[in-house]
């Protein structure tokens, strides 16, 4: 454990940020899973709706640095391709 006052403060701030980021990361993963679940169920309308809900959230979190922008782009690209491939 830190002895210096500023180091203690940084440890508290770091833990607070870790919890906040974990919550946001979990939310992003949940929205992505909803799209994959709709695709697996074969429901194109539900998949499109879930994707439209997921896209701005993923973009917002990638702009804030929670996930890398290339990872966000990769998720969106793969999901759009799978939705378009559905009958």
UniProtKB/Swiss-Prot annotation:
Molecular function as annotated in GO: small ribosomal subunit rRNA binding; structural constituent of ribosome
SUPFAM superfamilies xref list: Ribosomal protein S20
Gene3D superfamilies: Ribosomal protein S20 (1.20.58.110)
Keyword annotations of the record: Ribonucleoprotein, Ribosomal protein, RNA-binding, rRNA-binding
InterPro entries: Ribosomal_bS20, Ribosomal_bS20_sf
Keyword Signal: no
Segments for region (Disordered): 1-25
GO cellular component entries: cytosol; small ribosomal subunit
One family name in Pfam for this protein: Ribosomal_S20p
Keyword Ligase: no
One example of a Gene Ontology biological process annotation: translation
Function text: Binds directly to 16S ribosomal RNA.
Classification via PANTHER family: 30S RIBOSOMAL PROTEIN S20, SMALL RIBOSOMAL SUBUNIT PROTEIN BS20C
Family: Belongs to the bacterial ribosomal protein bS20 family.
Protein name in UniProt: Small ribosomal subunit protein bS20
Organism: Yersinia pestis
